[in-house]
């Protein structure tokens, strides 16, 4: 009797399984993506369904995602554009379902990517090929050291792989343009053109680095760096630059005009002055999240008298003393970590400013277009370079310390504007200056990039007199020269 009861139960179970299998074999609109080799009773989560199953360019697509885990802060990215779900999960048989709707790009990628936990840095959930096997586009471009700050997305790079410098703020992480979402779009566009992207990370507008002594600000800044380094959408970033001009009063507005000290910068960058076992510093956090991205020291402003350094350079000028003290701090910190068995705590390179001074009296009648190749030692500054060749002063300091000797240098701000003199490039740019500057830098193997400030910033007009795109006044000559240097 008991045997027959179990047999009947077994037959009912078999019937249920057959009906369930038949249900899944019925034709449905769209298609389920099946991972080869996965057992049918052990799905590879998430399961993705498309409608239509093989969409054509320009078609609107519905995409459903089914998973057993309630992932937060999910996104769908198509050709660099992020989409939020149009329908959120409702529990059905212990599974959760999201739905997106998007248009297949007429041109561009045929792969879409799903992410989760984007509030902490987007983590890949699933990649979906819209048609066939996805192959990364081949970008065959000739490298150049030439680059720009704030690239015009419509710029023709003439088949060259140049440089782009961008900017984001830790305290504006959720804001338009300066925050994470718009930054990821710009990085995607630049990478699609074969460009190398350097992202400068500031604490806040008017406050380049966390104010001296403010550990809460340090925690916030480091959390933002972790988020950027973790975000899969930013894997194409070549390097992160930590701050800029922090030795000047106007870059320390939240600190009552007190500039960041070399020691404080070292604390934020690599934990200088703290126990060697502590990991709450920029370089160790970024390396833990993304070992391949470079971590660069932000530029010291040349010719600023706002801050000095305790370790005097051979040329006793405040900005050079500051730089010498800063590099010394970073070298000391890296050596202390190495001694404790913690490698890779030295920076990967330095961003520097190198502006030209085409009206310098030291030119003494020589052509202003030749200024980048001419030494302009200024007597009142004890022989410090007064023009573009200040980059040589920076190199001398960087190469004087064991852990930084020979590291790459990136000129992330170059033009013919001198702070304090107030003459914009639209009024003083000498024809041929940029050509000469690139010729000089092409002969410097340690200098990897020469970036003009700026290309385009359409959100206000304050930089129009510097812009290659706006072409105000003499900037028309500079813009034509930039294009010619890239090639036909």
Residue locations for each model-derived region?
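Short proline/glycine-enriched turn/loop motifs at strand-loop junctions of beta-rich domains
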Residues: 67-73
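Edge beta-strands of extracellular beta-sandwich domains
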Residues: 121-133
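Aromatic-rich peripheral "rim/lid" segments of glycoside hydrolase catalytic domains that contact
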Residues: 136-137, 143, 147, 155-158, ...
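Noncatalytic carbohydrate-binding groove/subsite architecture in carbohydrate-active enzymes
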Residues: 195, 200-201, 218-222, 262-428, ...
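Surface-exposed, short loops/turns at beta-strand junctions within beta-sandwich domains
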Residues: 103-109
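N-terminal substrate-binding region of glycoside hydrolase catalytic domains
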Residues: 132-264, 297-303, 310-318, 373, ...
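Aromatic sugar-binding surface patches on proteins
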Residues: 91-101
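Short, compositionally biased P/S/T/A/G/V-rich stretches that sit at domain boundaries
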Residues: 31-61
């Amino acid at each position: 009797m008991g045997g027959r009861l179990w047999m009947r139960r077994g037959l009912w179970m078999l019937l249920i399984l057959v009906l369930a299998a038949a249900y899944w074999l019925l034709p449905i609109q769209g298609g389920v993506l099946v991972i080869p080799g996965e057992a049918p009773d052990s799905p590879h989560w998430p399961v993705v369904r498309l409608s239509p199953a093989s969409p054509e360019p320009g078609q609107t697509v519905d995409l459903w995602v089914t998973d057993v885990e309630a992932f937060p802060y999910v996104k769908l990215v198509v050709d660099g554009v992020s989409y939020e779900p149009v329908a959120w999960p409702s529990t059905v048989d212990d599974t959760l379902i999201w739905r997106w709707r998007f248009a297949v790009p007429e041109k561009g990628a045929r792969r879409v990517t799903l992410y989760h936990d984007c509030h902490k840095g987007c983590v890949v959930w699933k990649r979906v090929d819209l048609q066939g096997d996805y192959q990364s586009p081949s970008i065959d471009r000739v490298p150049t050291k030439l680059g720009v700050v704030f690239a015009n997305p419509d710029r023709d790079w003439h088949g060259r792989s140049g440089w782009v410098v961008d900017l984001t703020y830790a305290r504006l992480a959720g804001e338009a343009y300066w925050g994470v979402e718009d930054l990821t779009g710009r990085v995607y566009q630049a990478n699609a053109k074969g460009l190398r992207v350097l992202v400068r990370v500031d604490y806040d507008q008017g406050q380049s680095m966390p104010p001296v002594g403010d550990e809460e600000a340090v925690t916030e800044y480091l959390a933002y760096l972790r988020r950027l380094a973790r975000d899969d959408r930013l894997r194409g970033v070549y390097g992160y630059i930590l701050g800029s001009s922090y030795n000047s009063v106007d870059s320390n507005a939240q600190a009552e005009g007190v500039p960041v000290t070399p020691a404080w910068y070292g604390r934020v960058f690599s934990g200088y002055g703290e126990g060697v076992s502590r990991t709450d510093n920029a370089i160790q956090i970024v390396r833990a999240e993304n070992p391949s991205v470079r971590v660069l020291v932000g530029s010291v402003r040349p010719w600023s008298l706002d801050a000095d350094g305790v370790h005097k350079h051979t040329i006793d000028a405040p900005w050079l003393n500051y730089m010498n003290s800063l590099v010394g701090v970073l070298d000391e910190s890296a050596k202390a970590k190495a001694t404790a068995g913690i490698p890779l705590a030295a920076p990967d390179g330095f961003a520097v400013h190198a502006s030209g001074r085409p009206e310098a009296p030291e030119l003494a009648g020589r052509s202003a277009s030749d200024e980048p190749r001419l030494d302009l030692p200024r007597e009142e500054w004890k022989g410090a370079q007064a023009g573009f060749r200040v980059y040589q002063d920076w190199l001398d300091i960087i190469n004087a310390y064991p852990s930084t000797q020979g590291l790459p240098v990136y000129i992330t701000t170059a033009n013919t504007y001198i702070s304090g003199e107030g003459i914009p490039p639209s009024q003083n740019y000498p024809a041929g200056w940029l050509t000469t500057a690139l010729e000089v830098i092409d002969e410097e193997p340690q200098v990897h990039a020469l970036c003009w400030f700026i290309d385009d910033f359409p959100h206000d007009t304050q930089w129009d007199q510097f812009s290659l795109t706006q072409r105000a006044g003499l900037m028309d000559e500079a813009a034509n020269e930039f294009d010619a240097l890239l090639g036909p």
